[in-house]
């Protein structure tokens, strides 16, 4: 089953949005496989966003991510990466579809509440980076109520 890395950023944590964000993924039928509430070290943030290191906003992004605790999660389910991106909404909140997390809770791109894997391959890399110890092994009893097979 496909997995995606989802991170509630410091602004989402500070604003008390953790429960609502988790609820949106659960209500869709995805399964939480790993979760950490943590402060991110500068070097770790730089590693996570290494693909953006040549962008002018990179230093500010790193400062933002290390400014407070984040909630790092792994969600599992059919097409969880693409569907998760639709639940999250466009990076620029003003372009996000109504009802998405960013449309509902974000105003500026630099405080857009949440990060989600943008591809299955990047999801695998992000999960390996954030959860090197592995994930909980379990299968929800709800699985047959969500998936046909």
Curated annotation (Swiss-Prot):
Q: What induces it?
A: Up-regulated in the leaf sheaths of rice plants grown from seeds that were inoculated with the nonpathogenic P.fluorescens strain KH-1.
The source's superkingdom equals Eukaryota
Record-annotated residues binding ATP?
9, 57, 85, 91, 102, 112
Which EC number(s) does the record attach to this protein? Answer: 2.7.4.6
Family annotation (SUPFAM superfamilies): Nucleoside diphosphate kinase, NDK (SSF54919)
> Which residues belong to the signal peptide in this entry?
none
Q: Please list the reactions this protein catalyses.
A: a 2'-deoxyribonucleoside 5'-diphosphate + ATP = a 2'-deoxyribonucleoside 5'-triphosphate + ADP; a ribonucleoside 5'-diphosphate + ATP = a ribonucleoside 5'-triphosphate + ADP
Q: Where is the active site?
A: 115 (pros-phosphohistidine intermediate)
Q: Name one GO molecular function term.
A: metal ion binding
Cofactor requirement: Mg(2+)
Q: Which GO BP terms sit in this record?
A: CTP biosynthetic process; GTP biosynthetic process; UTP biosynthetic process
Which InterPro entries does the protein's record reference? Answer: NDK-like_dom (IPR034907), NDK-like_dom_sf (IPR036850), Nucleoside_diP_kinase (IPR001564), Nucleoside_diP_kinase_AS (IPR023005)
List UniProt keywords, sorted A-Z.
ATP-binding, Kinase, Magnesium, Metal-binding, Nucleotide metabolism, Nucleotide-binding, Phosphoprotein, Transferase
Q: Read off the SMART domains from this record.
A: NDK (SM00562)
Q: What does this protein do?
A: Major role in the synthesis of nucleoside triphosphates other than ATP. The ATP gamma phosphate is transferred to the NDP beta phosphate via a ping-pong mechanism, using a phosphorylated active-site intermediate. This NDK is microtubule-associated.
Similarity comment: family membership: Belongs to the NDK family.
**Assembly and oligomerization:** Homohexamer.
**What's the protein called, per UniProt?**
Nucleoside diphosphate kinase 1
Species annotation: Oryza sativa subsp. indica
Q: Provide the taxonomic classification.
A: Eukaryota, Viridiplantae, Streptophyta, Embryophyta, Tracheophyta
């Amino acid at each position: 089953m496909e997995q995606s890395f989802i991170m509630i950023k410091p602004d989402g944590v500070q604003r008390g949005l953790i429960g609502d964000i988790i609820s949106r993924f659960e209500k869709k039928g995805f399964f939480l496989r790993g979760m950490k509430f943590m402060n991110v070290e500068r070097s770790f943030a730089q590693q996570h966003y290494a693909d953006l290191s040549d962008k002018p906003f990179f230093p500010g992004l790193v400062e933002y991510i290390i400014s407070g605790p984040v909630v790092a999660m792994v969600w599992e389910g059919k097409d969880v990466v693409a569907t998760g991106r639709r639940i999250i909404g466009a990076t620029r909140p003003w372009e996000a579809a109504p009802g998405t997390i960013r449309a509902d809770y974000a105003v500026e791109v630099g405080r857009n509440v949440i990060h989600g894997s943008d591809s299955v391959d990047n999801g695998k890399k992000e999960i390996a980076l954030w959860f090197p110890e592995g994930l909980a092994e379990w299968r929800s009893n709800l699985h047959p109520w969500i998936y046909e097979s």
